[in-house]
Amino acid sequence: RYLPT
């Protein structure tokens, strides 16, 4: 979503 995790 926000972080590329």
UniProtKB/Swiss-Prot annotation:
Listed GO biological process terms: neuropeptide signaling pathway; proteolysis
Q: List the expressing tissues.
A: Found in the crab pericardial organs.
Transferase: present as a keyword of the record?
no
**Which molecular-function annotations from GO does this UniProt entry contain?**
serine-type peptidase activity
Q: Which UniProt keywords apply?
A: Hydrolase, Neuropeptide, Protease, Secreted, Serine protease
Q: Which GO terms describe its cellular component?
A: extracellular region
Listed name of the protein: Proctolin
Species of origin: Carcinus maenas
